[in-house]
Amino acid sequence: MAHPHQHLLTLFLTDDNGFYSYLSEKSDDEALEDINTIKKYMDFILSVLIRSKEKLENIGCSYEPMSESFKALIKVKDDGTLVKAFTKPLLNPHSEKIVLDRGYTSDFAISVIRLSSKSSYILPANTKYINPNENMYINNLISLLKRN
C-alpha cells in the first residue's frame, strides 16, 4: 500500500513541470498543505546531506559548496538593501501533463518517507521570512559590507 505522500513527493522530485500542474488544480489551502509536506521532506534530505558533508570534512575531505549551480536568490544593492533576484522565467502550470514516475524516483521518494519516519534527526522549525530592514544582524552585516 502506497504512503499518502509517496505520489506527491515523486511528482516533486521528477524533473518536469508536472508538480506545478498538480498544484494548479488544487485549492490554495490544499496546495499550501502539499508545499509544507514537500518542505518537511526537503528539510530532512538537507539535514542528511549537511550531516554527511560534515562527516567528510571531519576526516579532512574538503567539500565545496553544494549549491554551486544555483542562482542567487537575493542581492545587495548599492545602498545596502537586500532585494530578491529571480532569474527564472515564469512558467505555465498547464503546459505539461502530470506523469507519475514509477521507477527510481518513486523508489527514492518511498525511501525518504520511510527513513524520515524512523530518523532521530531533529529538524529545524519552519523557516520564516526575515525582513532585512528589521533584523539587527542583517543590518550590521550590510553596514560592514558598505564600508568595504
Curated annotation (Swiss-Prot):
GO CC field: host cell cytoplasm; virion component
InterPro entries noted in UniProt: Poxvirus_J1
Subcellular location: Virion; Host cytoplasm
Stimuli inducing this protein: Expressed in the late phase of the viral replicative cycle.
Keywords in alphabetical order: Host cytoplasm, Late protein, Virion
Subunit structure: Homodimer. Part of a complex composed of A30, G7, F10 kinase, A15, D2, D3, and J1. Interacts with A45.
Stated family: Belongs to the chordopoxvirinae J1 family.
Protein function: Late protein which is a part of a large complex required for early virion morphogenesis. This complex participates in the formation of virosomes and the incorporation of virosomal contents into nascent immature virions. J1 protein is required for DNA packaging during immature virions (IV) formation.
Name of the protein: Protein J1 homolog
Species the sequence originates in: Fowlpox virus (strain NVSL)
Lineage: Viruses, Varidnaviria, Bamfordvirae, Nucleocytoviricota, Pokkesviricetes
